[in-house]
């Protein structure tokens, strides 16, 4: 069993437990009653290389990363630093996240929020909207093709943006076929947890021009952002490098300023 398989087994059990408390009809009603979603795709297309800043306590590869007692305070610092989108991990077992974190961040910031989790079915899509998410992560490696296409449609039907994550050219082709408009190329292989920063540069140039391209994993500083920008990234998603920085607001601002500098490569579209 791969690391991804193990995570997905836990997620399915946790979703079933939540659905036993709040059924699908109730979570759909809560999603319908939520304020309209913000346009995350438009935020990512603003001038310069955008930064998606992540609230991340732990990971399967590194274990505990940061003791984030107040995710709202961290998210507010990210927004003050110029982040375009706040990513909030809600997977509990390996990443120590929660839907309560999502709620807290939604109350604290006015920019779009990404629910970062391992989505396995429609319940979680409506759950994300009910808790204030504007964007949802869909991992190609975790989903069959029909489910992927269906979940992209459902995400968009609720006014949210789907960030479709890939790690190989085959997965990128599947994402395009399923109708993805925003594709994240993860340098980390979720089956082995190994990181190869060259992955983005190998996959992104083959994506259609109109696709919004996000580089995920491996950003430790401005040099990494500039390298990803040179390979065609519209934005970078950064978690560990921010929560371990000691000054998250400044760390975000440094990346944002590098992405806005005239010397920074600009995506062609």
From Swiss-Prot:
Gene3D superfamilies from the UniProt entry: Aldolase class I
Primary enzyme class: lyase
Biological or metabolic pathway of the protein: Amino-acid biosynthesis; L-tryptophan biosynthesis; L-tryptophan from chorismate: step 4/5
Keywords, alphabetical: Amino-acid biosynthesis, Aromatic amino acid biosynthesis, Decarboxylase, Lyase, Tryptophan biosynthesis
EC number: 4.1.1.48
Keyword Lyase (UniProt): yes
Disulfide bonds: none
GO molecular function terms attached to this record: indole-3-glycerol-phosphate synthase activity; phosphoribosylanthranilate isomerase activity
Catalysed transformations (reactions): 1-(2-carboxyphenylamino)-1-deoxy-D-ribulose 5-phosphate + H(+) = (1S,2R)-1-C-(indol-3-yl)glycerol 3-phosphate + CO2 + H2O
Gene Ontology BP annotations: L-tryptophan biosynthetic process
PROSITE patterns: IGPS
Pfam families from the UniProt entry: IGPS (PF00218)
Domain of life of the native organism: Bacteria
Family (UniProt): Belongs to the TrpC family.
HAMAP family in alphabetical order: IGPS_A, IGPS_B
Protein name, UniProt field: Indole-3-glycerol phosphate synthase
Species per Swiss-Prot/TrEMBL record: Rhodococcus opacus (strain B4)
